[in-house]
Amino acid sequence: MAAMKTTPGLVNFFIFNSTYGPREGEEHEKIILYIPTEEDIDRKIKTIGLCEALVKFTETFAPDKPCESLHTQKSRQIFYQPEPDFWMIMTISIPFSEKIAKDGKNTIEYHYDDVLDNVLDAVLKQSYKMFKLFNGPFNYLSETYGREALKKRSEYFFLSYLQTLNFSSFDLLDIFAGIQFLPLDKNTFLKIQSFVNLIEHTFSQIKYTAFLYSDKLVWSGLEQEDMRILYKYLVTSLFPATIDSELADRSSQGYVVIQPKSHHGRFVTGPPDLKDIPTPRKPPRIFVNTDTEQEELLLICYKALDATICLLVSAPFPTLDFFKKLDMFIGPQLTTLANVICEQSSKKSLSSDQQYRYIYFNHMNLAQKSTIHSKKASVAGVSPEIMRLLGDISADFNSFQEDGETYVKTMSDCWVVGRKSDQREFFVILNQKSANLIEINEEVKKLSSCHFNNIFFMD
């Protein structure tokens, strides 16, 4: 009988600031958030105190880079300092399997290699960035609204956010957290750029704009890191929820009523319709440029067919009249642009590269391209073992901080190739059991020249 293997799961998650409770008897004041919330207060204080001691001890050896992770037999603890004096710590259980030995006794085997530090580190950092997107930095909240407000907002956000995480599914793509760009011809791109400029000129409340088509970014006026986290929110949370809502509406009605309209545009965030309601539904509030200033803006997303335009709007809160003018101005032109892009994309899809399994990431512009986990991929999925191997190779590239190339043949006769060149990483998975190293190298070159011919890779 095969042994059942557990999956990694969240043990605890906490945020603290040592300066909030520096004296004896005030240790509980350091705690901003501790999950599970029902944990005994003495246990919380003891756990955080141990982590504080580890941080202070490791600071003596590396002041700029103290404790990053703690490995034990049953768990992995990840440390992250997002802001001065603020620490976020996440503990994950190590998967294990229980086997029955010949003498009848149960033995437990822990699978340490199933949990990668660099992957968990990326997940923890992502959780902070997502919190900051909707609430602002910790210190800003504390100074502006007080510590109690910081604690309440942290609890409200992270209790919901952490429930959405599946720790057995995270991999190299979560480390990169890149952006998929949509390549277009010059004329189409200029039309989109002119359209965006015209919108920002016509509506002075709009500070930044992003244009996406079918979950791929076409244009953005935001800073790179702000767009990175906003893109993550859009493609993993907002857009899928919108599609689910549309399908639910259709199934509940049993049919779809097509209203006569000059365009196919509608608001994804904002008023669900443009009837004369007194107060339209408030769009999400987000924070950008938090490193230099606190820009608090409203996120208005407007969709026509597969094209979505994201508008970041400053105060005051837009009126219903504002939304109506936006709809009349954007709807027809966005519908036309969506049809143009659709026609161009359909031509390119004829020469698809889905027969290859690869990941490409550019650290300079965050461009990411992958056929792994792709909904359109016609090839078989990639096993968790191979994904962990990709994570290990990338970690090696990062530790050496030099360009290089790695070829690995797995026990299942699968070839894995990793290349790093000029801040770009490229990974290919090939199921060619009888191929030798020279043949695999030629196959990778063929893939590079066919689909990345304008990108230089070291030979």
UniProtKB/Swiss-Prot annotation:
GO CC terms of this entry: intracellular membrane-bounded organelle; Mon1-Ccz1 complex
Superkingdom of the source species: Eukaryota
Pfam families, alphabetized: Intu_longin_1 (PF19031), Intu_longin_2 (PF19032), Intu_longin_3 (PF19033)
InterPro entries for this protein: Ccz1, CCZ1/INTU/HSP4_longin_1, CCZ1/INTU/HSP4_longin_3, CCZ1/INTU_longin_2
Gene Ontology BP annotations: vesicle-mediated transport
Leader peptide range in chain numbering: none
Family of this protein: Belongs to the CCZ1 family.
Protein name: Vacuolar fusion protein CCZ1 homolog
Species: Nematostella vectensis
